[in-house]
Amino acid sequence: MRTLFLNPPSFEGFDGGAGSRWPASREIESYWYPVWLCYPAGLIPDSKVLDAPPHKVSIDQTAAMASDYELLVLFTSTPGFNVDVKIAGMMKDINPKLKVAFVGPPVTIEPEKSLRASTAIDFVVKKEFDYAIRDFAMGKSLSEIPSVVFRKNGDFQHNPDAPVIEDLDALPWVSKVYKRDLDFRRYNVPFLLHPYISFYTSRGCPAQCTFCLWPQTHSGHRWRLRSSDDIVNECRWTLENFPGLKEIFFDDDTFNYQKARTIELCS
């Protein structure tokens, strides 16, 4: 299926969406990469990632793209959920055959409430959605895909949760999706050099911090690692393919959780 992965347009002053672990309003402009959308996008050949806020794509411009795709995957956040629902409805009005999936923290915590918010949402995927979205785009029925919640016979069907992804090396490099679909010069964070690239070297965090979004709503508490070789190779590729790049940032929940692994990677 032709698939659009969307970090939707947001209201002015909102620093959130597909890449932010702390969705909030802000006083200065900053943008994180939509990294969670880019992993499954790398698994689907006929896909595109649209990160609307940093690329200054309006709601109307976004909605107009609906006719070009068969599947919309929208990463939503709690502050932006109501606006995201309206955007999905606009796109469904333009292309009634468009299948719409919502992913992100709100749908993990309250999947039924999310589906009740709009009939434009066909299904939601809880927590890690990389392979669930790939499988649907490749033709699997919703009833066969773990972690999916959808409407069926006037009720909601909750499929069993998928196990966490253990083999992180099997996932695509998000840097290649950045190169394909995003302008890396548009991303900035005040405490990082500009321009920068960020990606993950691990998923999950054993800590129980209440202020951090991802372990509770997306990646879980089991700490899983990419191999050092895979990380180093992606770093090399990134440096070769993004002229002028000044920093690579590892946005892990707990990068230095294991001392020996940190030393191995840094050496």
Show the residue positions of the predicted features:
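Short glycine-rich His-centered loop
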Residues: 1-31
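Short beta-strand segments
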Residues: 4-7, 51, 73-78, 102-103, ...
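Short, glycine/serine-rich, charged loops/turns that create anion-binding
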Residues: 10, 54, 107, 204, ...
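Short aromatic-enriched loop/helix-cap "lid" or pocket-rim segments at secondary-structure transitions
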Residues: 14-19, 114, 161-162, 171, ...
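Conserved alpha-helical elements of sugar-nucleotide-dependent glycosyltransferases
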Residues: 29-39, 230
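Glycine-rich beta-alpha loop elements in corrinoid/cobalamin-binding modules
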Residues: 36, 40-167
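N-terminal [4Fe-4S]-dependent radical SAM core
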Residues: 142-145, 151-198
